[in-house]
Structures are given as structure tokens and as C-alpha cells.
Amino acid sequence: MVLPTTKDATAAGAGFDTVRIIGDIDALAEKHAGHEDVFRSAVSRLLKAELAKVRDAAQAKLLRDRHGRHCAEWLCFVQDEIIRLSFSAATRHLYHSPIPSDGERMAVVATGGYGRGLMAPESDIDLLFILPYKQTAWGEQVAEAILYCLWDMGLNVGHATRSVNESIRQARRDMTVRTGILEARFLTGDRALYDELISRFDTEVVQGTAAEFVAAKLAEREERHHRAGQSRYLVEPNVKDGKGGLRDLHTLFWIAKYVYRVRESHELLRRNVFDVREYRTFRRCADFLWSVRCNLHFATGRAEERLSFDLQREIAVRLGYTSHPGMQDVERFMKHYFLTAKDVGDLTAILCAKLEDQQAKPAPVLSRAMSKPPGAEVRRVPDSDDFIIDNNRINLAAPDLFKRDPVNLIRLFRLAQKNNLAFHPDALRMVRRSRRLINAQLREDPESNRLFIEILTSNDAETVLRRMNETGVLGEFIRAFGKIVSMMQFNMYHHYTVDEHLIRCIGILQDIERGDNDEVALAGELMRTINPEHRPVIYIATLLHDVAKGRPEDHSIAGARVARRLCPRLGFNAADTELVAWLIEQHLTMSKVAQSRDLSDRKTIENFAAVVQSVERMKLLTILTTADIRGVGPGVWNGWKAQLLRTLYYETEPVLTGGFSEVNRAQRMAAAEAEFRAAFTEWSGHELNAYIARHYPAYWLKVDLEHKIRHARFLRASEQSGRKLNINVGFDEARGVTELTILAADHPWLLSIIAGACASAGANIVDAQIYTTTDGQALDTIAISREYERDEDEGRRAARIAEIIEQVLEGRLRLPDVMPSRAAGKRLRPFVVEPKVTINNQWSDRHTMIEVSGLDRPGLLFQLTTAISKLNLNIASAHVATFGERARDVFYVTDLLGARITAPTRQAAIKRALVHLLASGNTAE
């Protein structure tokens, strides 16, 4: 990295008057002569106060000019001065040696991140005390004096004291030490010791070991990405260690320094590692990431490196982002962040390409594992004279082939896919430089569009589309897609940026088509039976279903408009274009109906059938819905949701076919019972028959096999123990929840009591599956957010919930007496969800449906059920779901006489009461 010159740093650090502070330290030495401990404490207090003033000034300047790298340089300069002052105080006033011996020499050196000359406000300080020989009493005293001064100031200091010989020995065998010395920067003391270390390091450690170092750093990078999250598009990224973060830039520069022996980042231009545009990108990325990191540290007062939801909005405001129609300020900031992370990935690929170029020359740069194998030859790609195969990677046969025929910008990716070839870094670099050739003419070209559909519908489309996206080709070719590249949705439900989500959905769709995943068995079965002509339809609908995110209007409706404009260009006829548009417009419908409607109510099925209108469209919508839910992130798809979709599909099929179904309800009941009998062999046939009769058909059709078996064991254990109320605890690591299965005598207020008990124990309900047995027992499975790391602690919390439920049911406890006053948790505070209450009688002939949506918070379900009961309504069934920070609960209700709520004035009163309840918990910071 470029270091500040003395002149620049001094100017930047105006307000830190080194000369004055030296005078103050001298005065303290005179005042406290003979009292070393008092003098040390006084110096620490003085320097701490001066540093605090500088940090305040640095933060104010950062908020004004938003130049993160300048802020990091300023803070580093001041820290350098503080270390020099503490060294001066130690050697002039505490351990002064008028005629120092050869052993009384020391160089104080900055290493690691501090050695780069850039420092975030709460960063650690890494120091190396270099001695000529072994440790001496004088050296130990001086080093301790400096360290205690820094520690007393509240700074985090990592340190080592070594001779030059020992430093060289350790650098040879320890890559961490080697990297630290690579970044070493002289601070104060004996310059000759530092120069000796660097000279010997270059000749005795670095020389001839470039391949080893590069391999180690790239392996370290992969391990770091694995720990921080492999995707650079995770929506709560680690600014320092995440993919596309500052550490990746540092790794680039470490490799460049080691291989090319450069000291300053601008030397990368002279060595032709980067061209001018790429170097500017390097500097721009560094400045932006340093701005984010410095603001994170200032905002939290700690070395916080993760851009969590509760910090993203504050950092966006600090950096001056404003909201635009369809996009919040925080979403615009995070889009900039992810675009920067993408640029960092591009720079990494460019450096790797340069290193591979070097490998072809005599100077050894890379290890054999990264170089061309002996005998590797360059040959033409089959069916093309424009591309070559270089070490099993596709490359350009001529540098001007994109200019000669811009269709080659699409053809490159199709040929790589067709021939199972990796991409040569040089080819990707040329693609990035040629993106401007993708114009209206190329977008309308029939051949380029044919090639794109082949890419989309052929093997390994996810990998190829991701390469197209990373190089910018996908966003230029489909401009609507370009608008959602690196777009983050500011919510806790989606795990990835919009473009990454869509590309992952294509990969999931191909998993579904291969049929090798039992978790999506229904979608796999349907994929094999759709009209073959509709295969491209489901692929393009999957790629485009969220393409209109970030617009002011409903993204489903806007996305359908995009499809109607785009699909004819891609070769779809009018009927298929309209089918794609319909799938995009309805892509949320099936999930919503399955998870928040009563699937045992005939009206629900009829309404859904009226939307889909044909079995073929329902098949396609089921496949798209499955891919969409699975693509949201780990743990979002589960057995409950799979079973609900299956139930909705097979309940609707007979309505669409006039009574005919490939699998009718009776057959599905028989199949579900047979599946349970085959899997659960612990009971006799008589016991199984009796148990199966305890559940209504809806239970057997909607509950997945794993939970059916768990419930059977639980009910048997409860009977044997004689307990009227029992709770079984399970842990779902994939979803990050604890499942409470509650068996109790059915009670009109039972759901409210369960919700209140969970709230009183600090448990937040995120999902609920509620059933009643034929003998009047309630069997409710409640998923609560996991609070504790250890299962034992979660188990104790569950026991507390069971105790509260039992005491309330027996009349020994009133819930209001144990309900805490809880605001939204820290994770929810940044979010605002507009309260929404919908009341209608169209989804049921027997009940009125009340759908509420708002910001989730502890105790919300208890508050809602209590409010509904106080409104003189009976809850017939409830469908509880949480999507990140958003709660969406549906209640099927009647009045106390069992009638639906039809009076507009009564509906309005219910709506007002529930909206007020939801609004009382809305928050944002």
C-alpha cells in the first residue's frame, strides 16, 4: 500500500504537536524524578488524552470527506508518533545509557497490518523489537516500558522481541512470521538493525521461495473465505476477512511484493501487473473498504469487522447514502459494497493471470501444482477457429476476435460449457475489457440469443452464468438483470444478493431435474412430466423471477412486464412468453397459500385452482416455488414446507381435472399410512391401526414422515408417564431453531397460552404447526429461535415453558404476572415493517380469514391471539410463519356464535385494533 510521506502525514495529523508533547514529557520527567511508576502513569495519561483528541478529529474528518484511506493513514501516523514518544521517554528518562554498548541497541518495527501504514481506529498494533543478539536487561526494560505505556492507554498490542538471526530462522519455517516481516516498517531506534533484517530477509528467505509463498497465501485465503462465508454476496459480510474484503486486497499485495519485489502499490503499474484502469480500481476498492471499516470501528467503539444488519443503516448514513424510489439508503450502500467485492475478485483473477504468464518464462513463480503440466499443448476448440484450449482452459485464438464478431462474447461461455472447459484468466480479462461491445445489435442478434438459451438450459449452467455475471456480460446482455447485480434486500430472510439468489436457483433447478435430491422429490417428479417444450420456459422464469426487485412497484408484476419484452428476443413464441410472464407474476402465490392458508378448507383449494387454471401451469409453478425457497439460503427449505406444497398440489389437482387426479386423496392417505407403517416398525399392527385412527386426514397429508415418527413416540411416552401435559424438545441445526412439540388437552386459549409461555421465557416463535387428535388432544409443534449454544441450556428453557403452560392451565399462574416488557431485539431494531391486516371471507365458506403482517418481536403471537380473543372471536386454526424480521400470521376465526364476520363496521374495528397492536412494536434506528 502507498504510505504517507512525512510531509503528507504531518499535514494530515495536524493537531498532534509532537514537539509540544516532547516538552510536556520532559516536564513530567522533571516533576516526577525518582518516581518511575508515577512518571510512567503520567506519560500514559498524557498520550491517551492526545490520542483521544486525534480520534475525535479523525472521525469528524471522515464524516465530512469520507476518505477512509486518508483516515487510516492519519491514525497510523499518530500511532507511530506515540510509539516514538514512548520509546523516547523510556530511553531518555527511564533507562538512559549515555554510552550504549553494542548490545544496548534496539529497532522498533511495525509489522502485520500496522506495518502497511494504514490503521483502523480499533485495530491491533503489531510490534517487533529487533535486538542485535540475545535479550539483554536493557532491551527487556525498554520493550516493557513501551508495552506498558500502550496497554495503559487501552490499546491492543501484539509483540515479539527477537534478534535478527532468530527473526530469519522463524520466517523460514513460519508463514505468519514471514508475512509479518514482509510488511515490516521501521518506526524508531537503530535503523541499521532494521536494514540488516530486511536485507537478509530478501536474500535468505524470499529468494527462490515465491511458489511456496503464493501457494500458502492462496490456501490461507480459501480457508479464510470458508470461515467467513464462501460467497462474496452474503448479506452480512465481514469487511476484513470476507470474500472480496480488505484481506483479499492485502493478499494481492503480499503476493505482488513477494513475487515482484515491489514496495508500493503504484509499482504494480510499472511491473505491468495492472493497467491504469485496474490500478484505479485497486485504489478505489481500498479507499471504499477502509471507509466502511473505519466507520464500523468508530460507530461501535470496538474492532467490529462484520456489517451486521443493525450496523448497515448507520454506516449507510455515515457514508452519505440516500433513499431512492424502490431502494432504501442502506440497500444502495450495500449494493456499492457488493460491487466493490466483485471488483476485488476481478483483481485477484488478473493477478493470477499475470503470475501464470510469468510461469511460461524462465523465472520460477508458481508451484508445479499451479503450472502447466509437462507436455501440455495448445489446440483448437472443436467446431471453432476463434478459441483455443490451453491446459484444459478456453482462451482466445486472437486478441481481436471479440471486436471482429461480438457474438463471440456469448459463444465463449457456451463453448466452455459444451466442452467442459475452465476459463483461462486471460480470456476473462479480455471479456471484461470488451463489455462495451455488447450493444443493442448484439442483444437482438438471433445467434447470440440462441446461444444464451443453450447456456441457460445445459449442464452446469449455474457455474457458467456466475462467470458471465462476474465478468459483466450477463448484466449487459440482459439489462434488467444488470440492474439487480449486487443488489441486497434489507431484510433478515434473504441470505444472498438478488443476482446470486437467481443464479443459485438455476443450480437448484438443475438438481431438481437430475432427481438426485429426495428433499425436492415432488418437484423432481413434476419436472419429468412437464411438456418438453416448456423446459426453456421454467428455466428463463427461474432466472428472471426476481429481476424487477428494487423498483417502486410490485416486483412480481414489474418482472412479468420485463419478461413480456425480453422473451420474444430470446426466441419464445407468444404463448410461451405469456406463460413465463404468468409464472413470474405468480411466483410467490403457491408458497403463500401453502404456508398461510387452511389446506383442509375446500374454498382454499378452489381459489388456488382458479389462479393456476391448468395442471401444467401448476406443475411449473410448483417447480419454480421449490427452487425459489431453496435458493433463499441454508435452512429455509424444510420437510414441513415440502409436505405443505405436496398437499396443496395434490388437493388442487382433482379440481383442475374435473375429479381426476394422478394420485387422488384416498390414494394419498393410503400411501401416507403405508409409508408410516413401513418406517415405524416398533409397534404391532393393532397398535398402529389405533394410532393412525387418532389423527385426522389433514395430519397424515400435511406432516412429514420424520415428524410423524417423532410424534408417535412422544404420544406413547406421554401415555406411559401419565402426564396430561408433556413437551418434547428437538433441535434443528439447519434452521437454527428449537422445536417444542406440546401435547395437552385441547383448550380454546391453548395457542395463546403457549405463545405467552414462550414469550415469558424469552422464546421467539418463528413457526407453528397446530393439530388436534380425534380424541381431543392438541398436538402443536412450535419452532422458537435458538437462544443458547448448548442443547442443555435450550432444554432447560423448554422445561420452563412447559412449567408455565401447566401452571396457567391449572389456574396456578396468570400470564400477565410473568410476561416481561420486551422490545424488539437488537437484530430487529434496524427494520421497519409496515403493519398490514387483511380480513376477507373469500378463502373459506365457514370462517373469516384474518391475515396480519408486521415486524416480529418477542411475544407477538401471544399479543395477537389475546387481542383476537378479547375481540370476542374464536380462533379455529392458526398458520404462523416468520420470514426474517417479518411475521406473517393467519387466523381462521368466527364470532362466538360460530358465524363469519361479515359486517364492514365489525371488520374495520378488528382491523384498527390489530394494526394498532402491530404498530406499537415497529422500530428503526
UniProtKB/Swiss-Prot annotation:
Keyword Phosphoprotein among UniProt keywords: no
InterPro entries per record: ACT-like_dom_sf, ACT_dom, HD/PDEase_dom, HD_domain, NT_sf, PII_UdlTrfase/GS_AdlTrfase, Polymerase_NTP_transf_dom, UTase/UR
Coiled coil regions in record: none
UniProt-listed SMART domains: HDc
Span of domain HD: 498-621
UniProt xrefs under Pfam families: ACT (PF01842), GlnD_UR_UTase (PF08335), HD (PF01966), NTP_transf_2 (PF01909)
Residue numbers spanned by region Uridylyl-removing: 383-738
GO biological process: regulation of nitrogen utilization
Necessary cofactors: Mg(2+)
Keyword Iron found: no
Keyword annotations: Hydrolase, Magnesium, Multifunctional enzyme, Nucleotidyltransferase, Repeat, Transferase
HAMAP family given in the database record: PII_uridylyl_transf (MF_00277)
Free-text function comment from the UniProt entry: Modifies, by uridylylation and deuridylylation, the PII regulatory proteins (GlnB and homologs), in response to the nitrogen status of the cell that GlnD senses through the glutamine level. Under low glutamine levels, catalyzes the conversion of the PII proteins and UTP to PII-UMP and PPi, while under higher glutamine levels, GlnD hydrolyzes PII-UMP to PII and UMP (deuridylylation). Thus, controls uridylylation state and activity of the PII proteins, and plays an important role in the regulation of nitrogen assimilation and metabolism.
Entry protein name: Bifunctional uridylyltransferase/uridylyl-removing enzyme
Recorded name of the encoding gene: glnD
